[in-house]
Amino acid sequence: MSENDLFGAADAPESMTRPLAVRMRPRTLDEVIGQTQVLGQGSPLRRLANPASKGSLTAPSSVILFGPPGVGKTTLATIVAGQSGRVFEELSAVTSGVKDVRDVLTRAHERLVSRGQETVLFIDEVHRFSKSQQDALLPAVENRDVTFIGATTENPSFSIIKPLLSRSVVVKLESLEPDQLIELVQRALTDDRGLRGEVKATDEAIADIVRMAGGDARKSLTILEAAAGAVTGDEARKKGARRPIITPEILARRWLTSCS
């Protein structure tokens, strides 16, 4: 998938049927909530996201994003590709083998040689790759045929082979703070890509969502979306109902608490 396909899809009408967490993905590093400790000026991710980094020998050729679920690892990889103008290729370590890796690397090399177009190769759950699968990445990383970004919830010191780790910048991501999750939920309630102001939530309900999410941005939006669906269904059955409001009582429903 190219970055044009990826980010163009966010503006398509049918994208409103996608999960809220997908619709609300930041499109630039400046839209990202949290992770300020690794997104400052001059940081590896900022440098990679700069279009001027293409062809640069000083920008990192390999980055390992290490952190718990829901902190933005996939989002950051797609932003780096989109902002810098690189093609985005994605593999899952769960379903991809050595042949899949080599096929992507071959395409990336041909793209670079024939059109001068660089590629971001993103591999989710890279800690699940075997030694031979990780070994297959080394030549392309060394030759800068791709900018490799791997995501892992496991300590890279124990899950990534030493030759690849020594060529990588490790970026540690943290769970979001409560105030950051509050900002995220409030943005999703009003943003045109989110709930468009069609549903409200009390401060107490937002606090409950944040508590249930436990620092996980994706989980907070999943809970919010489920609650919005529940309260919208309730209000639709009432004649003359005003804008639906998410309350702690809605969030306490047994089926909805399973989202957390």
Language-model features and meaning:
Residues 229-259:
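Conserved C-terminal helix/linker of AAA+ ATPases
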Residues 40-43, 86-120, 130-131:
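Short glycine-rich substrate-engagement loop in P-loop NTPases that contacts/grips substrate
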Residues 2-16, 48-92, 106-109, 138-143:
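Walker A/P-loop
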Residues 185-206:
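Helix-loop-helix "sensor" segment of P-loop NTPases
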Residues 61, 114-120, 143-149, 169:
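Loop/turn-to-beta-strand initiation segments
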Residues 207-212, 218-233, 250-253:
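C-terminal helical "lid" of AAA+/P-loop NTPase domains
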Residues 92, 169-182:
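Conserved AAA+ ATPase "SRH/arginine-finger" region at the nucleotide-binding site
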Residues 46, 51-53, 123, 127-166:
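Conserved catalytic/switch belt of AAA+ P-loop NTPases
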